[in-house]
């Protein structure tokens, strides 16, 4: 069902940030999952960790899914706060929480993150759960903020925290860090269990991006600052089209 040539074409498109190839019909999520380590190896040589996707229950129903999905992060995908990114009409911005973990999946630290997701399908009919999964859920680049020790972290305080995203000083999103999978603690437990179920190897010092809080934002040009309350902020600029 999923040929080596398709994976090669996908890896090339993802690496070069060009349009994805056409997909054969009928690829399921179950078909896609075993191919993700192979694709990730082709794109970046190794995985930087795991990402959660389609964590919104309404979206899951829309796609006919019974649970969220996971993908793998590319080793070359992490960038620094303050980075400049070229404009891409296919980029979406996701406000997330990140968890670092050891090779056994045990949590090390937790903090804010922003993920940049990109899916440029050649045909509308190619946008299916299986094909999205096969593309590592659109994994591209991400920024992690200041990370805090997991064991001493006050998870109860997250319930009162607001994530506020601004573009050129105007608020474009207000959301909660508990919105995706009930927060980073439960997200970590679910994602590690899913990765183990799928037989994925976990990198030492790996990163979990725990899913989109609120709506994904269109990657319009501008200066962005994502405020995570007492956890700090992440900023970046998307250059003009």
Write out the residue ranges for each language-model feature.
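Short, structured beta-strand/loop micro-motifs enriched in basic residues and often containing a Trp
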Residues: 187-193, 206-208
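Conserved metal-binding segment of the jelly-roll/cupin
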Residues: 202-215, 219
């Amino acid at each position: 069902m999923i040929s080596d040539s398709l994976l090669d074409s996908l890896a090339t498109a993802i690496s070069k940030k060009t349009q994805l190839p056409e997909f054969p019909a009928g690829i399921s999520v179950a078909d896609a999952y075993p191919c993700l380590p192979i694709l990730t190896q082709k794109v970046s040589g190794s995985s930087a960790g795991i990402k959660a996707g389609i964590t919104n229950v309404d979206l899951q129903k829309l796609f006919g899914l019974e649970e969220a999905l996971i993908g793998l992060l590319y080793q070359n995908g992490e960038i620094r706060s303050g980075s400049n990114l070229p404009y891409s009409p296919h980029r979406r911005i996701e406000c997330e929480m990140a968890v670092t973990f050891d090779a056994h999946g045990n949590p090390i630290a937790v903090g804010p993150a922003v993920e940049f997701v990109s899916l440029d399908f050649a045909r509308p009919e190619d946008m299916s759960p299986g094909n999205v999964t096969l593309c590592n859920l659109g994994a591209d680049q991400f920024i992690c903020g200041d990370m805090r020790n997991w064991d001493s972290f006050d998870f109860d305080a997250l319930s009162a925290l607001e994530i506020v995203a601004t573009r050129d000083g105007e608020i474009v999103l207000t959301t909660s860090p508990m919105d995706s999978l009930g927060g980073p603690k439960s997200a970590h437990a679910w994602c590690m269990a899913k990765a183990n179920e799928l037989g994925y190897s976990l990198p030492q010092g790996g990163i979990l991006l725990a899913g989109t809080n609120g709506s994904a934002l269109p990657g319009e040009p501008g200066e962005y600052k994502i405020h995570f309350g007492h956890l700090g902020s992440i900023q970046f600029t998307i250059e003009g089209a």
